[in-house]
Amino acid sequence: MISASRAAAARLVGTAASRSPAAARPQDGWNGLSHEAFRFVSRRDYASEAIKGAVVGIDLGTTNSCVAVMEGKQAKVLENAEGARTTPSVVAFTADGERLVGMPAKRQAVTNPNNTFYATKRLIGRRYDDPEVQKDTKNVPFKIVRASNGDAWVEAHGKLYSPSQIGAFVLMKMKETAENYLGHTAKNAVITVPAYFNDSQRQATKDAGQISGLNVLRVINEPTAAALAYGLDKSEDKVIAVYDLGGGTFDISILEIQKGVFEVKSTNGDTFLGGEDFDQALLRHIVKEFKRETGVDLTKDNMALQRVREAAEKAKCELSSSVQTDINLPYLTMDASGPKHLNMKLTRAQFEGIVTDLIKRTIAPCQKAMQDAEVSKSDIGEVILVGGMTRMPKVQQTVQDLFGRAPSKAVNPDEAVAIGAAIQGGVLAGDVTDVLLLDVTPLSLGIETLGGVFTKLINRNTTIPTKKSQVFSTAADGQTQVEIKVCQGEREMAGDNKLLGQFTLIGIPPAPRGVPQIEVTFDIDANGIVHVSAKDKGTGREQQIVIQSSGGLSKDDIENMVKNAEKYAEEDRRKKERVEAVNMAEGIIHDTETKMEEFKDQLPADECNKLKEEISKMRALLAGKDSETGENIRQAASSLQQASLKLFEMAYKKMASEREGSGSSGTGEQKEDQKEEKQ
């Protein structure tokens, strides 16, 4: 036996026994794509079991989210309850426990910064100790904490929430938007993720979908979705680059489009680079200038910082279309000398200088993606811009310099990803039949072998789904178990890469080192999620896992979060019922009082007084509406309405009889007149 640490180091004894459909495949197929590969991919895409109902496409963004559905052969972006086509990915919890999502949450962020969560997609699937998370803790007003499993979670009013839960609350809002449009329950969804997301982040996104009550049919990469949106109605074959600089992440993908086949050649990116970093850089500049001018440091004042953050975002957007903007924040803070106001002019050139390093960080991934795809910039027929930050003129100029051509404006940078997700949903549902999507895994996968070396089994930019096996052996005499450590990344040593998970194959018969044959198989599904198995070829003993890191959400965690989400959904339903009942009651009170004033001469005084008492009771009930159910308010309002109807019926009868009486006397006078005329 050897120590546990060395048990992790299985020794490589053989070459790869490839099971990959990409390996040794005949090249005589359609458009250079083998028939075997076509069958392998399409078998998963065109599932035999029929998908019932519409499949919604959701772009779960860092800053904003968007939802679309297929209508015939066209994808339609849906408007939310506020009438907007995108929804802020913001979730807030008020002091009384109410949960707000989208624009209502964003509007109250200034007065409730500590309990308003934004850009939590940057935390999804990440460990608390990750350098990026530690950097983020200094930049946000809310609390990022270490969960019991070591992941980064957030805290509001003493309650902990996983980033998957926060994502689920946003997804529930998108689901509700789709259901309002469709008129029925939306169950199936395709959700997008940044192309450079690792396995943990993809799994956490899928968990968010499950928590929200969605059946996530597929997780697809954002640039690939944008390419679908761009190329669905295009007939010419070409190589395109998708430059996706969004709110929190950056991706670059090189794709080849041929007769409805969208094949990703390579992908690269940075999962911690986006509009949030541009906002943060500008915020730091404003705070620094304000301190230089007034001597007041705003960094300890969360409410003031939130106002500056919102002003920075607004200024950033304005400078995409104008060369100068004013930042005015009256009564931002105060000191012993009185209130302090912020008044600042900011030019586009100044802003570009502040964020130039961030823009430069997108260049190396683009060059690497072209290198991996084995294309030069002259081979690229179109450059597609995706993500709100690509509206910035300096970003567009950088892209033009990098690829040697002006970028295309053929797609809406805010909506293209959701449209592409809806198209993929149409493919899975069988409604779109002339599209085939061949995506890739963004990072290499392998295991830790003797000496802590990272041995790759599947290289980055391998077309998925894919499967590959390799034979390893024991590192010590008499070893009866092997611990398999599964890693993802590009570094030579396993410890420098992302540890996705680990498991142990036990029951290996004692033998000299190098004799047992342990076959490790990696299977990456069409979602980019990894499944691993290890098999002792001598005994046939096998151990299989779907990779779940030491962090991540357990099945019980997800079930509890689903219940909590359902509880919130039920609370939202009750709240909506109560609001509707209150509106109805207030309308009845207003109508009743108006009619009482109008018909006061026809109404008996005692009956009027009784009705006024009913109205007073109704008003008292509405004063304590937060503790009442919608049903109680509705019943009380209905009783008031019935009482008022009876009273007004009496008034109507009285008026009718009066008119009848006056009408009779009028008829008699007319007869007398006629009689006189005849004489």
Curated annotation (Swiss-Prot):
Q: Which residues carry this modification: Phosphoserine?
A: 408
Q: Does the keyword Transferase apply?
A: no
Its induction note reads: Not induced by heat shock, instead protein abundance is decreased.
Which HAMAP family does its entry note?
Answer: DnaK
Gene name of the encoded protein = Hspa9
- What superkingdom does the record give? Eukaryota
| UniProt comment concerning the protein's domains | The N-terminal nucleotide binding domain (NBD) is responsible for binding and hydrolyzing ATP. The C-terminal substrate-binding domain (SBD) binds to the client/substrate proteins. The two domains are allosterically coupled so that, when ATP is bound to the NBD, the SBD binds relatively weakly to clients. When ADP is bound in the NBD, a conformational change enhances the affinity of the SBD for client proteins.
| Name of the protein described by the UniProt record | Stress-70 protein, mitochondrial
Residues where ADP binds: 63-64, 313, 316, 320, 388, 391
Protein's UniProt keywords contain Aminoacyl-tRNA synthetase: no
Activity regulation (record text): The chaperone activity is regulated by ATP-induced allosteric coupling of the nucleotide-binding (NBD) and substrate-binding (SBD) domains. ATP binding in the NBD leads to a conformational change in the NBD, which is transferred through the interdomain linker (IDL) to the substrate-binding domain (SBD). This elicits a reduced substrate affinity and a faster substrate exchange rate. Upon hydrolysis of ATP to ADP, the protein undergoes a conformational change that increases its affinity for substrate proteins.
* SUPFAM superfamilies (UniProt xref): Actin-like ATPase domain (SSF53067), Heat shock protein 70kD (HSP70), peptide-binding domain (SSF100920)
